[in-house]
Every structure is written in structure tokens, then in C-alpha cells.
Amino acid sequence: MLKEFEGQMPKIDKKAHAFESADLIGKVEMKEYSSAWFNVTIRGDVNRIEVGRYSNIQDNCCLHVADDYACIVGDFVTVGHGAILHACTVEDHCLIGMHATVLDGSVIGHGSIVAAGAVVTKGTKVPPFSLVAGIPAKVIKTLDESNLDNIHAQAVKYKDLWSCLLYTSDAADE
């Protein structure tokens, strides 16, 4: 459901998709080929949220903002089931694991992976090409650029999945 908040309506590129059970509220922009899956909440009430090209926000995720921080998701980012992104920045080609939490003012550097269940605490700056895990999340490994191919492929796969689901749904309605 798209919901206006204080005169701001979510903007979804015509080549992006939000499933019916996803709630997008206020200052939200979804760029081309991005997707918001089932039961996602993306609430841009007191600041803005941007979801980059080919990025996918999987089932049961929550994206929110703070007065001082927007929530920015770069291009080719996968945000795993049940993750929470609160007023943070996730740079391009990142993977946020299932049920991970990234808190206010944090920046996840290009090509990084946040492990499932990790909690990235307020203001943390994760260097590019890092694997972080734990509570609080710490860098446990430096990654190389070979991981970008897998992260990129995962993002493209989710674009293909939602396209396939829509096509199958449309065919069933006929």
C-alpha cells in the first residue's frame, strides 16, 4: 500500500515493484528494477528513504529514518528477510543478512556483507569490502572484489523473480 504522509507520496519507478502487502509511506523513492517484497514497511515520515537500482528489500523488512538521518540503500543491494535498516546508508553491492539490524548514522561500505542477526550499532562506519558479524557487529574478514559478482547476481536474480511472479499472476488472472 502506498500512503501519503504530510503531502509526500512514495515514488516508485515504473520498472520497480512493491508487492501489495508492502507498506510504503511518505518520502520514499524506489529506483528502476528495485523491489519491496511481502510485508515490508518502508516509512519515510520525518526524513527520506531511497532504494537504489536492482536492490531488493525482502519479506518482513523494516526501513525507517530519523530526524537527522535519511535511509539510503545503494544499487544492487540485497536486504535479507526480516532485516531492519534504521536511518543508515548502505552503499552499492552490499548484502544485509536475514534479521540483521543497522542503526542510525551507520554506513555500510561498498561491497560489504552484514551477517545474519548482526547488529551494527549507531554511527558505525563499516569499511568497503568487509564482512561484519556479531552483537555489536565487528569486522571479521576483509573481502575481495570477487564477492561483487555473487552480490550482483543475487540482486539481478530477485529482479527476475518478481518479474516472473508478476507474469505468472497476470496469466492466472486471464
Question: Positions of the model-derived regions?
Answer:
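Short beta->alpha connector loops at strand-helix junctions that form conserved
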Residues: 65-67, 143
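A charged, well-structured terminal subsegment
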Residues: 152-166
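Left-handed beta-helix
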Residues: 14, 19-20, 25-26, 31-32, ...
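Extreme N-terminal tail/first-helix region
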Residues: 1-15
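Conserved small/polar residues in nucleotide/adenosyl-binding loops
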Residues: 167-172
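Short, glycine/acidic-enriched loop or turn micro-motifs at the edges of active sites
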Residues: 137, 173
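Conserved beta-strand-loop-alpha-helix hinge in the C-terminal portion
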Residues: 129-130, 138-149
